[in-house]
Swiss-Prot record:
Cellular component GO terms held in the UniProt record: cytoplasm; ribonuclease H2 complex
Family: Belongs to the RNase HII family.
Cofactors (names): Mn(2+); Mg(2+)
Species in which this protein is naturally found: Borrelia duttonii (strain Ly)
InterPro entries, sorted: RNase_HII, RNase_HII/HIII, RNase_HII/HIII_dom, RNaseH-like_sf, RNaseH_sf
Name used for this protein in its record: Ribonuclease HII
Chain positions recorded as a divalent metal cation binding sites: D6, E7, D98
Keyword Transcription: no
PROSITE patterns per UniProt: RNASE_H_2
Keywords: Cytoplasm, Endonuclease, Hydrolase, Manganese, Metal-binding, Nuclease
EC number(s) on file: 3.1.26.4
Cofactor: binding details: Manganese or magnesium. Binds 1 divalent metal ion per monomer in the absence of substrate. May bind a second metal ion after substrate binding.
RNase H type-2 domain span: 1-181
GO biological process: DNA replication, removal of RNA primer; mismatch repair
């Protein structure tokens, strides 16, 4: 079994970093449609996410902005990946992680693959379901904090988001260790 792991929200200034771990139950027929979540439309991501969730074992883990501020985004991303894999509770022959750093994971074999979210099906799948999951969370936060445009900016440091911070102030879910304005 091969497990793919990826994270989303690393460059955001609001909310958690979120990771997903994915193991396909069998080889699904939609693998040729997978790609890095950043290259797919919202509609395509949501469509593929539903297919992935039906055809894979998966787990999510998120690390809050408070912990990000304490341990930094790099360590928080690795921790989210580690926890997502542990939550799967399935032993894999090979764990493939997007990026160049390896989280603390007990596995027979583990490799970090730069641009893995564009090359490895399991990492592509993790990228997609993680992005859809975090985007849904941002839509929910937008209902609570409508002045910050989270439904649109998804917590990223857009001009509108930074202008909202200048006008309305920093929220408890903003990452204080990041350049906010």
């Amino acid at each position: 079994m091969i497990c793919g792991i990826d994270e989303v929200g690393r460059g955001c200034i609001f909310g958690p970093v979120l990771s997903a771990a994915v193991i396909f139950k069998s080889k699904p027929n939609f693998l040729n449609e997978l790609d890095d979540s950043k290259k797919l439309t919202k509609t395509k991501r949501e469509y593929l996410s539903a297919l992935i969730l039906e055809n894979a074992y998966y787990a999510f883990a998120d690390i809050s902005n408070e912990i990000i501020d304490k341990i930094n985004i790099h360590n928080a991303s690795l921790l989210a990946m580690q926890i997502a894999y542990q939550k799967l509770n399935i032993e894999c022959n090979l764990v493939l992680v997007d990026g160049k750093f390896i989280p603390k994971i007990q596995a027979k074999q583990i490799r970090a693959i730069i641009k893995g979210d564009s090359m490895i099906d399991e990492i592509k799948a993790a990228s997609i379901i993680a992005k859809v999951q975090r985007d849904k969370l941002m839509v929910e936060y937008d209902k609570i904090y409508p002045l910050y445009g989270l439904k649109k900016n998804k917590g990223y440091p857009t001009k509108e988001h930074k202008d909202a911070i200048k006008k309305h102030g920093i929220l408890s879910l903003h990452r204080k260790s990041f350049q906010l304005i």
